[in-house]
UniProtKB/Swiss-Prot annotation:
It comes from Penicillium chrysogenum. The gene is aatA. It is an enzyme of class 2 (transferase). This is Isopenicillin-N N-acyltransferase. 6-aminopenicillanate binds at D121, R310. The keyword Methyltransferase does not apply. Induction: The transcription factor rfx1 controls penicillin biosynthesis through the regulation of the acvA, ipnA and aatA transcription. Its EC number is 2.3.1.164. Pfam families: AAT (PF03417). GO terms for molecular function: isopenicillin-N N-acyltransferase activity.
Length: 357
């Protein structure tokens, strides 16, 4: 997996990302265009109008992130609107038209810390678009995350020990002035605690479309289950655990209807809770949970199967909060294509300390 270290001003960070991942970003854009056109059935002119509005909102409300997007576009030699599209793809594909995708996420508190993880399931073709980013910024924790090339926030953790996961939800609707999901993920990744991440996202005044974000460290974890008109907070159960898949667990507004989630979302949720009941608390056992193939191919470890399952688990990430490290398995955990561990050095730890001051 391509690994890019980005540092400096927001524009410089974006430029390094864009120039190093130029070819991969081109593939990400091609995929996003096909996905959005297929999901929304809207004309190019209608999509252009929505994209223009979302771009203006990002520029006005989060100029730092817009500068990074502008830097990516410059480095990748693409139009800024194309990078805006990548970073608002959820709002297009899920806000304008209910879509169906799967992921499984879990957090488990232990006597000496916590373990947190996710299987990220999506269309198999996007695996080649995944990259690994390390971003160093003055006054903020260093962040390390796995993302699709061109997208500024996704699944990862920071040198303050805050880890972030992301699941699709199926509440239709789009509020163009709300926070795009990938901007919210970046806000969480730049926070010094789960509580701060939750507060900072809520303070933005609402989300643009529906999704679920889990934020955890060694001491606490929260889930943000949101739609364009509501944000609900998921907390740990009596056993210090939290599990989420791709259906709503919390009550939203009476006019907000969940539209046809994947039936296996309930199966995966129940299966993960069942597996955690027998979990012995070791990292090795936690890692094995993500390779579970019960109800194959619609299992926690999802598999592509022609005519049945259109997606697959493209990567698994496990955060060991006691060790302050994350293990990534690219591909299905049963037979990964690549495995690596992400850690922070002393310089990164100092950045986290300074961010707390």
């Amino acid at each position: 997996m391509l690994h890019i270290l980005c540092q400096g001003t927001p524009f410089e960070i974006g430029y390094e990302h864009g120039s190093a991942a130029k070819a991969v970003i081109a593939r990400s854009i091609d995929f996003a265009v096909d996905l959005i056109r297929g999901k929304t059935k809207k004309t190019d002119e209608e999509l252009k109008q929505v994209l223009s509005q979302l771009g203006r909102v990002i520029e006005e409300r989060w100029p730092k992130y817009y500068e990074e997007i502008r830097g990516i576009a410059k480095g990748a030699e693409r139009d800024v609107s194309e990078i805006v599209m990548l970073n608002t793809r959820t709002e297009f594909a899920y806000g304008l038209k209910a879509a169906r995708d799967g992921c499984t996420t879990a957090y488990c508190q232990l006597p000496n810390g916590a373990l947190q993880g996710q299987n990220w399931d999506f269309f198999s073709a996007t695996k080649e678009n995944l990259i690994r980013l390390t971003i160093r910024q003055a006054g903020l924790p260093t962040i390390k995350f796995i993302t699709e090339a061109g997208i500024i926030g996704k699944v990862g953790f920071n040198s303050a020990g805050v880890a972030v996961n992301y699941n699709a939800l199926h509440l239709q609707g789009l509020r163009p002035t709300g926070v795009p999901s990938h901007i919210a993920l970046r806000i969480a990744l730049e926070s010094t605690s789960p509580s701060q991440a939750y507060d900072r996202i809520v303070e933005q005044g609402g989300m643009a479309a529906s999704a679920f974000i889990m934020v955890g460290n060694g001491h606490e974890a929260f889930g943000l289950e949101f739609s364009p008109t509501s944000i609900r907070k998921q907390v740990l159960d009596a056993n210090g655990r939290m599990v989420h898949t791709n259906h709503c667990l919390l009550q939203h507004g009476k006019n907000e209807k969940e539209l046809d989630p994947l039936p296996d979302s309930w199966n995966r949720h129940q299966r993960m809770e069942f597996l955690l009941d027998g979990f012995d608390g070791t990292k090795q056992a936690f890692a094995q949970l993500w390779a579970d193939e019960d109800n194959y191919p619609f299992s926690i470890c999802r598999a592509y199967e022609e005519g049945k399952s259109r997606g697959a688990t493209l990567f698994n990430i496990i955060y060991d909060h006691a060790r302050r490290e994350a293990t990534v398995r690219l591909g299905r955990p049963t037979n990964p294509d690549e495995m690596f561990v992400m850690r922070f050095d002393e310089e990164d730890e100092r950045s986290a300390l300074n961010a707390r001051l």
